[in-house]
């Protein structure tokens, strides 16, 4: 981040809840923002994260959750994909270093497209992976001027009930997108075995079966495609 200090503002937060609230505030103000935390940190940040799913965003908002299957350096092995389901969040799951870069760009675009936060779900082996990554040209995101929208961002019951209905409409649109998006596609090889994968499980399956199986590789795993 120090390489881009003239263009990108970053800070440490006292805890994950504060980090999420700061990122949400930046999004409301009209800029793209993200906060990153390990899996147990999302427990701390759950309060604002559940609510921003209702309110939506202005600038793109991405919440990175790093899970730790196998408990290599964590106090539990919780699966934060369940948070995405409970909070009704759009979720992306990259399987490689290249996809981490590509999906992050997509996450901001989808956040703004659907007026919704995106949970960017990674795991230990993805976070510790190394690989050659093609970066491409830097693209500056447009600043969206702040507008005072009480009915959108003040989640008092009178507003929140309407937000809840609106959220279901957005989720239906996300599901339709998931059915055809380029990161949810079959990979055909031998058709005797089929494996449905997401995240690092795609790499494990390919290492085990190679071309002796076909794969349905899901990069956008929630809302679930029908």
Task: Please describe what each predicted stretch is.
Residues 94-226:
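Flexible, low-complexity linker and terminal segments
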Residues 1-97, 125, 182, 188-192, ...:
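Thiamine diphosphate
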């Amino acid at each position: 981040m120090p390489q881009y200090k003239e263009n990108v503002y970053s800070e440490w937060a006292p805890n994950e809840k504060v980090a999420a609230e700061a990122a949400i505030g930046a999004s409301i103000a009209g800029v793209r923002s993200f906060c990153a935390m390990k899996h147990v940190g999302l427990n701390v940040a759950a309060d604002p994260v559940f609510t921003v799913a209702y309110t939506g965003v202005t600038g793109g908002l991405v919440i990175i959750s790093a899970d730790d299957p196998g408990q290599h350096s964590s106090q539990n092995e919780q699966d934060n994909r369940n948070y995405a389901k409970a909070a009704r969040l759009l979720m992306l799951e990259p399987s490689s270093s290249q996809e981490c870069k590509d999906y992050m760009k997509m996450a901001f675009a989808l956040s703004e497209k659907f007026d919704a936060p995106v949970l960017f779900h990674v795991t230990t082996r993805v976070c510790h992976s190394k690989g050659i990554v093609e970066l491409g040209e830097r693209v500056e995101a447009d600043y969206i001027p702040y507008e005072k929208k009480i009915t959108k961002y003040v989640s008092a019951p009178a507003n929140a009930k309407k937000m809840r209905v609106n959220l279901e409409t957005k989720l239906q649109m996300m599901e339709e997108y998931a059915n055809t998006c380029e990161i949810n596609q079959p990979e055909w090889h031998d058709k005797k075995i089929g494996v449905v994968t997401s995240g690092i499980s795609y790499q494990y399956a390919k290492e085990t079966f190679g071309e002796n199986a076909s794969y349905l590789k899901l990069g956008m795993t929630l809302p679930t495609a029908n």
